[in-house]
């Protein structure tokens, strides 16, 4: 492999929606940082068989609904 072109791999903590934490090697963040998941196999309707739950963390869905309210979306 060519030197200096590949990102550095390091250990990070991944926090699932139920609070469990596990370690993985990743290029995300810095060594020891924690990535908190908003959706994972424990909470996703595709794996749980439940109804879809809309997570509007950035307000994008609300903005879309307000913009196109007259169209009946």
Swiss-Prot record:
Organism of this sequence: Cereibacter sphaeroides (strain ATCC 17025 / ATH 2.4.3) (Rhodobacter sphaeroides)
Protein name according to UniProt: Large ribosomal subunit protein bL31
Function summary: Binds the 23S rRNA.
GO molecular function list: rRNA binding; structural constituent of ribosome
Record keyword Ribosomal protein present: yes
Subunit (UniProt): Part of the 50S ribosomal subunit.
Domain of life: Bacteria
HAMAP family (alphabetical): Ribosomal_bL31_1
Sorted UniProt keywords: Ribonucleoprotein, Ribosomal protein, RNA-binding, rRNA-binding
Pfam families: Ribosomal_L31
GO CC terms: ribonucleoprotein complex; ribosome
Gene Ontology biological-process entries: translation
Family: Belongs to the bacterial ribosomal protein bL31 family. Type A subfamily.
